[in-house]
């Protein structure tokens, strides 16, 4: 998916009915009526970093019908006087450990006559370490459109993303006779471990 940089991009997602997936999530609002919203935001963002990375868009309502639950319906702007970009950044940095490098928060004004009504876009890179939600002391990972607690092996797998074997393969193609086919002996003169 291309980076979302304008209201036109948002409208294109809605018009095309681009469904949520592992790398895209819609949130209709940021409910700050209780303190649970901080833990929920930390869970959503850390889960996406622990999976493949992706984008969370705050300010898009999905359809209520079960069969269309993950499809965007319409824009539901977030009021910046209630939740600012700085507040979101603070919640993320103080509730996820370690901090997610390369995370970006952007803000799109929905209607220029109402500058306090915005959509927040959080672009989350795939991480090379596991991120913990400090509110729950758990590690989460996004699977398609759901978020689950991670198993021990999944946490270890994420922490080893930067470790790759150094393998070089050399091939030689040549035409062989039928008789040579039965006598092929592999050579390993360039095998490095």
Residue ranges and their predicted role:
Residues 1-24, 28-54, 61-65, 154-193:
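Bergerat-fold GHKL/Histidine-kinase-like ATPase
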Residues 32, 77-80, 136, 141:
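Generic structural "secondary-structure junction" signal
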Residues 99-184:
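Mixed-charge intrinsically disordered linker/loop segments at interdomain junctions
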Residues 35, 63-115:
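A broadly used, surface-exposed interaction patch
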Residues 24, 28, 73, 132, ...:
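Flexible, active-site-adjacent loop/turn segments at secondary-structure boundaries
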Residues 57-59, 121:
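A structural signal for short, well-ordered beta-strand segments and their strand-loop junctions
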Residues 50-53, 93, 97, 127:
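Non-catalytic alpha-helical coupling and interface elements of nucleotide-dependent molecular machines
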């Amino acid at each position: 998916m291309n980076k979302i940089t304008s209201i036109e991009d948002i409208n294109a997602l809605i018009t095309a009915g681009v469904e949520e997936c592992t790398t895209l999530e819609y949130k209709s609002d940021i409910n700050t009526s209780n303190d649970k919203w901080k833990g929920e935001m930390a869970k959503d963002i850390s889960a996406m970093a622990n999976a493949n990375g992706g984008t969370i868009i705050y300010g898009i309502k999905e359809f209520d019908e079960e069969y269309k639950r993950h499809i965007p319906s319409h824009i539901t702007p977030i009021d910046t006087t209630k939740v600012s970009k700085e507040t979101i950044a603070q919640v993320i940095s103080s509730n996820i450990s370690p901090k997610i490098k390369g995370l970006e928060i952007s803000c799109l004004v929905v209607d220029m006559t109402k500058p306090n009504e915005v959509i927040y876009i959080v672009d989350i890179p795939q991480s090379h370490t596991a991120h913990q939600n400090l509110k729950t002391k758990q590690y989460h990972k996004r699977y398609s459109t759901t978020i689950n607690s991670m198993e021990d092996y999944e946490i270890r797998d994420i922490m080893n993303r930067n470790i790759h074997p150094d393998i070089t393969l050399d091939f030689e193609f040549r035409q062989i006779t039928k008789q040579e086919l039965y006598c092929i002996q592999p050579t390993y003169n360039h095998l490095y471990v």
